[in-house]
Curated annotation (Swiss-Prot):
Probably involved in transcriptional regulation. Pfam families: SAGA-Tad1. It comes from the Eukaryota. GO terms for cellular component: cytosol; focal adhesion; nucleoplasm; SAGA complex. One of its GO terms (biological process) is regulation of transcription by RNA polymerase II. Belongs to the TADA1 family. This is Transcriptional adapter 1. It is found in: Nucleus. InterPro entries: Hfi1/Tada1 (IPR024738). Component of the STAGA transcription coactivator-HAT complex, at least composed of SUPT3H, GCN5L2, TAF5L, TAF6L, SUPT7L, TADA3L, TAD1L, TAF10, TAF12, TRRAP and TAF9. Disulfide bonds: none annotated. Its main location: nucleus. Keywords: Nucleus, Transcription, Transcription regulation.
Length: 335
């Protein structure tokens, strides 16, 4: 692991020295490429414009090092992540620099300007199924959590923008756990607005959607509901082999469940439709503390509002006419 880190830092240092005053523009283009705002070819063209002919290899070396760092835990084929360039490339070990290399570059340069059919190198258009497109790596496209390699790549780019040299494995693990817990908080806030739940220690929510609800017309129901033994009392000196946070005995738990069932209502709550954007919008408005950052909160609320939809009067009228026609057609068939 230390070898990959040293290679990445060395490649970054060489690239920064080759770029000079253009290093900020290069980091901005790299961030756009990671966000898929620009394509790989456009990023290469901008990098070649900022670098000289002799320093283009530092661009390839840096990208190869950063992709290798992000894919350490994944087995990749040899040479993955290398960016092709028809000009100068990094000097290979065992091959000394000399006039032979310069002459080959001149030959390639002259060969590029030989007349040929421009359509011969055009890429043929092949229709692809959107589900089989593997180039989309954004979470909004894949509908999945970002992988560890994707988070590490984004963190490395952000660290370079703020003048940092590297990202540790502990920082990546902390961000992974933070993303998971953040999504759990959002889901808990949405479900708690739709289903009943119980509290433990005054703040921990559990037993979502429980059918056992207190009967308001029975005096003992509220008492039985509020006097549950949620955790055993803390022992000053637990015995050997005894877990101080163990559950209540099975007999006590069975008696509590029977008492709650006897004191609960007779009717079960009606089934709810699937969670939609309106439920998420209401949950974020009520539980404002789920997204404490105002900038992130305002941006996501705006996105949710843009995706809200409900039928207007014309659509409702058309649906009514359509149902009447279907009913009339079914009546004619029965006759």
């Amino acid at each position: 692991m230390a070898t990959f880190v040293s290679e990445l830092e060395a490649a970054k240092k060489n690239l920064s020295e080759a770029l000079g005053d253009n290093v900020k523009q290069y980091w901005a283009n790299l961030k756009l490429w990671f966000k898929q705002k620009i394509s790989k070819e456009e990023f290469d063209l901008e990098a070649h414009r900022l670098l000289t002919q002799d320093n283009v290899h530092s661009h390839n070396d840096f990208l190869l090092a950063i992709l290798t760092r992000c894919q350490i835990l994944v087995s990749t084929p040899e040479g993955a992540g290398s960016l092709p360039w028809t000009g100068g490339s990094a000097a290979k070990p065992g091959k000394p620099k000399g006039k032979k290399k310069l002459s080959s570059v001149r030959q390639k340069f002259d060969h590029r300007f030989q007349p040929q059919n421009p359509l011969s190198g055009a890429q043929q258009f092949v229709a692809k199924d959107p589900q089989d497109d593997d180039d989309l790596k954004l979470c909004s496209h894949t509908m999945m959590l970002p992988t560890r390699g994707q988070l590490e790549g984004r963190m490395i780019v952000t660290a370079y923008e703020h003048g940092l040299d590297n990202v540790t494995e502990e920082a990546v693990s902390a961000v992974v756990y933070a993303v998971e817990n953040h999504l759990k908080d959002i889901l808990s806030s949405v479900v708690s607005r739709r289903k009943a739940y119980r509290l433990r220690d005054g703040h921990f929510k559990y037993a979502f959607g429980s059918n056992v609800t207190p009967q308001p017309y029975l005096k003992n129901s509220v008492v039985a509901y509020n006097s549950l033994i949620e955790s055993p009392p803390a022992l000053s000196a637990p015995f050997a082999g005894q877990n101080p946070a163990s559950h209540p005995p099975p007999d006590d738990a069975e008696q509590q469940a029977a008492l709650l069932l006897a004191c609960s209502g007779d009717t079960l709550p009606a089934s709810l439709p699937p969670v939609n954007m309106y439920d998420l919008f209401e949950a974020l408005q009520v539980h404002r503390e789920v997204i404490p950052t105002h900038t992130v909160y305002a941006l996501n609320i705006e996105r949710i509002i843009m995706k809200l939809w409900h039928p207007n009067h014309e659509e409702l009228q058309q649906d009514k006419v359509h149902r009447q026609r279907l009913a009339a057609k079914e009546g004619l068939l029965f006759c």
